């Protein structure tokens, strides 16, 4: 697992098994379920565990609280976890690893979207096989409005 052994914040990924259904919930409600480094690492690990569990037939990802699926990266931790070349590399490896786990799992994946699905949350949703959303869900890529570029590998899933 990329970034293993690093100092990470409290992890906020809820993993549940309900019969043949694997559930992964992003739970950082005070930040609209924005992803911390620890959450990215736990997301990849949860998907890897479900991939290796023969009793799981489908994986459903959702946001806790009913107001946001995921608001992307938790920018409040950028100073700590993205302030040096090494920390940026560790962060990017965690995002890429968890996204790869999600894209390549050989079980159907469903993004259950309710509320905000922006930035990295949009990326997570596009890595899933299916996306189901409420009528009031909001999709956006805010970095584009700020003139920030995306890594090419981060643009691949939405374009496929």
Question: Where do the language-model regions lie?
Answer:
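Hydrophobic/aromatic residues within transmembrane alpha-helices
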Residues: 24, 61, 74, 124-125
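CoA-thioester-processing core
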Residues: 98-104, 112, 118-160
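Conserved CoA-thioester-binding segment of acyl-CoA-metabolizing enzymes
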Residues: 1-62
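Acidic-histidine catalytic/liganding microenvironments
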Residues: 53, 105-106
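Glycine- (often His-adjacent) and acidic-residue-rich active-site loop
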Residues: 31, 63-101, 147
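Conserved phosphate-binding and hydrolysis motifs of nucleotide-dependent enzymes
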Residues: 33, 72, 115, 121
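Hydrophobic alpha-helical membrane-association signature
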Residues: 39-42, 91-94, 124
């Amino acid at each position: 697992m990329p970034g293993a052994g690093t100092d990470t914040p409290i992890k906020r990924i809820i993993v549940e098994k309900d019969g043949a259904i694997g559930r992964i919930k992003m739970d950082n409600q005070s930040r609209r379920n924005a992803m911390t480094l620890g959450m990215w690492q736990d997301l990849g690990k949860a998907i890897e565990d479900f991939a290796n569990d023969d009793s799981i037939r489908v994986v459903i990802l959702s946001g806790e609280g009913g107001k946001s699926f995921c608001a992307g990266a938790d920018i409040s931790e950028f100073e700590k976890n993205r302030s040096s070349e090494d920390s940026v590399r560790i962060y990017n490896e965690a995002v890429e690893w968890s996204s790869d786990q999600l894209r390549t799992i050989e079980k159907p994946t469903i993004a259950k979207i309710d509320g905000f699905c922006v930035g990295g949350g949009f990326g997570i949703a596009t890595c899933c096989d299916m996306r189901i959303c409420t009528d009031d869900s909001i999709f956006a890529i805010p970095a584009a409005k700020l003139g920030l570029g995306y890594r090419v590998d981060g643009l691949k899933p939405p374009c496929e």
